[in-house]
């Protein structure tokens, strides 16, 4: 029976009970299985389009030379749009600029009235300006050394006097503003 042509076997199919008894696999059972797998493959491949396939194939191929590798990297960078996190990383890596290096920033311009007003406030407090302290620090850095006992005691007295004058001025400003508000 198997030696006959396949189309004839499918037409002259014996009942299933006889096939089970003979132990021979049914010829029709193989056909739906192969069709099902083909149908499943078509469904799986329909999920992906040709662009995806080409993209996957391009990334899996290894470049033949270093020049093409660099070109691929440049193309990927050009295609990639910068996102929020990329911009954040760039901002983090950028060195902070000094105020004089920032575009459009200019140091404040003091008028003669501002300078006179600063000197009159120092005169009101009764403390002389700290010119001696400034003279000590001109030769070195902007910090003063307190290792010398004479300079440390002088510094502490002057700073205490200056702090008291600042407190008095700030209290005066607070009381004046409170009275104006009432």
Swiss-Prot record:
Residues 22-37 have a biased composition (Low complexity). Keywords: Cytoplasm, Nucleus, Phosphoprotein. Belongs to the TDRP family. Strongly expressed in testis. Also detected at lower levels in epididymis, bone marrow and kidney. Contributes to normal sperm motility, but not essential for male fertility. It comes from Mus musculus (Mouse). This is Testis development-related protein. The modification Phosphoserine is found at residue 7. It is found in: Nucleus; Cytoplasm. Residues 116-125 have a biased composition (Basic and acidic residues). Residues 59-70 have a biased composition (Polar residues). GO terms for cellular component: cytoplasm; cytosol; nucleus. Pfam families: TDRP. GO terms for biological process: spermatogenesis. Residues 1-38, 52-73, 95-151 are annotated as: Disordered. The keyword Nucleus applies. InterPro entries: TDRP. Disruption phenotype: Viable with no gross morphological defects. Morphology of testis tissue and mature epididymal sperm is normal. Sperm counts are also normal. Sperm motility is reduced, however this has no significant effect on male fertility. Interacts with PRM2.
